[in-house]
């Protein structure tokens, strides 16, 4: 398995073990900044699909003997190399043991991407809309998490590194927050929290208040909503569901079609389809907003 993975084995007469030297010569793309995690400051480097190159990016940032790499192979057919990275003095031994135990349970034939092993790392039996396993393509972000005692899992063939454990509030954090004044970083983070709760609760509040407690709304707003509802054939609930479905369809189309066309699809979906639906009287303008 080591030879098939590109290692050279160094044997010495009289010893019952050999040294495995990483001399892989596989072709891989150059290091570049990940498009999904842009930053104003900091490094412009991102992980690539070569595991050994990714490990070197981590080692260059954490020059400590406390940093440990544990290599293993998963996948009966693919024999994919996977590496656990952690600081021995800071990592939780209990969590580390659970992660290793869960990885040993994986019985897949092929592992082509780090997403294959995420279901095995999440808490079993606890239903949550938010994953307890984080993901990043930035070496500096990953090294910051490792320095906090987290466990990083890198999979050969993908630039997406996994972080265990990962908490809900970390979805609102960004490495740029640590490069600015604490006042601005705090304001930006609270702005993210507010935007999250508005985007998740506002549609339901709009439908609930407009349908069951319209007296709460000011008179001018209530009159505009009543005028919009009177010109559409659907209820507010059905309008909201339709708009959410259209948004998900346009988002999926923008992700899957070629990149030059993705921006055009977003513009067409937001402007043309929305304006046409309102003009035709299928949905109301307040609901679309």
Task: List the model feature ranges, each with a label.
Residues 196-199, 205-208, 213-289:
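Generic detector of multi-pass transmembrane helix bundles and their immediately adjacent loops
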Residues 1-239:
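Cytosolic regulatory modules rich in charged/polar residues
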């Amino acid at each position: 398995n080591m030879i098939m993975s590109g290692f050279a084995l160094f044997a010495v007469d009289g010893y019952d073990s050999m040294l495995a030297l990483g001399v892989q010569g596989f072709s891989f793309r150059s290091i570049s900044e990940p498009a999904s995690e842009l930053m104003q400051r900091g490094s412009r480097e991102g992980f690539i699909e070569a595991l050994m190159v990714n490990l070197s990016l981590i080692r260059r940032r954490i020059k400590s003997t406390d940093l440990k790499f544990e290599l293993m192979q998963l996948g009966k057919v693919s024999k994919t190399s996977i590496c656990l990275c952690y600081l021995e003095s800071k990592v939780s031994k209990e969590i580390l043991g659970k992660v290793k135990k869960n990885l040993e349970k994986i019985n897949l034939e092929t592992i082509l991407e780090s997403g294959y092993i995420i279901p095995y790392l999440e808490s079993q039996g606890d239903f949550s809309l938010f994953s307890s396993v984080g993901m990043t393509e930035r070496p500096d972000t990953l090294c910051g998490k490792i320095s906090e005692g987290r466990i990083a899992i890198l999979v050969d063939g993908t630039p997406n590194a996994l972080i265990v454990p990962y908490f809900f509030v970390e979805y609102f954090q960004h490495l740029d927050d640590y490069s600015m004044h604490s006042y601005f970083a705090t304001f930006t983070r609270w702005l993210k929290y507010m935007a999250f709760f508005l985007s998740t609760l506002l549609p339901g509040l709009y439908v609930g208040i407009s349908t069951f407690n319209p007296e709460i709304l000011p008179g001018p707003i209530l009159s505009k909503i009543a005028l919009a509802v009177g010109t559409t054939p659907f209820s507010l609930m059905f309008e909201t569901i339709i708009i959410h479905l259209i948004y998900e369809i346009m988002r999926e189309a923008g992700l899957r079609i070629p990149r030059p066309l993705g921006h055009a699809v977003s513009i067409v979906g937001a402007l043309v389809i929305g304006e046409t639906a309102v003009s035709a009287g299928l949905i109301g303008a307040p609901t679309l907003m």
